[in-house]
Amino acid sequence: MKKYLFIFYIGLIALLSGCGSEAECPLNSVSLARFNFMDSKTHAGVKLTNGATVTGITISDGKAEVDTVFNKAESYMSVPLSYTDQTTYVIHYTETMRDTIELTHKNRPFVSDIECPAMMFFEVENIRYTTNALDSVKLINPEITNEEKVNFHIYYRVASAE
C-alpha cells in the first residue's frame, strides 16, 4: 500500500509542477500598420524624402489631436492606429504639398492570456486617399495585429533617370 501511495504522490507532484502560473506574453503588444513606399511602374521600394513628415489625426470628444508619427527617410513606415473606428494620416512633403490617407477599421480587443496585457487588433474595412504626390494606395493585408507584416503599399510616380 505504501508503494501505491508513494507513486500517487510522485504523480501528483509531477502533475502540479507542470501547471505553471507564468504566462508567456508576447514581447510586442502594440499593433502597427506597415506601409511600404513603392514605385508605381517598377514596384521597387522607394524612400520617402528627408523633409517628409507623417502626422496622425485623431478625433476624440469633438477635438482633433495631431501627432507626428513618422519623420524618417525610409522605404516603409510602421504607424499606430486610433482606438476610434477611423484613423487619418497626413503625409507632409513640403509646407504646401501633402496627401491624406484615411482608414476605416473595426477594433478588436485581444487578450492572449489573463496574465498578459490586453492588445487591440484592427481590421481595415475601407481606405480613402488623395493623389497630390502619391499615385495610389493598395491594401495588402487588412488584419493589423502585433505581428510585423506589410499591410499597405503606397505607390508613387517616380521620375525616370533617362
Region locations from a protein language model:
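Positively charged n-region of N-terminal signal peptides that target proteins for export
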Residues: 1-4
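Extracytoplasmic cysteine-anchoring/structural motifs
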Residues: 20-25, 75-162
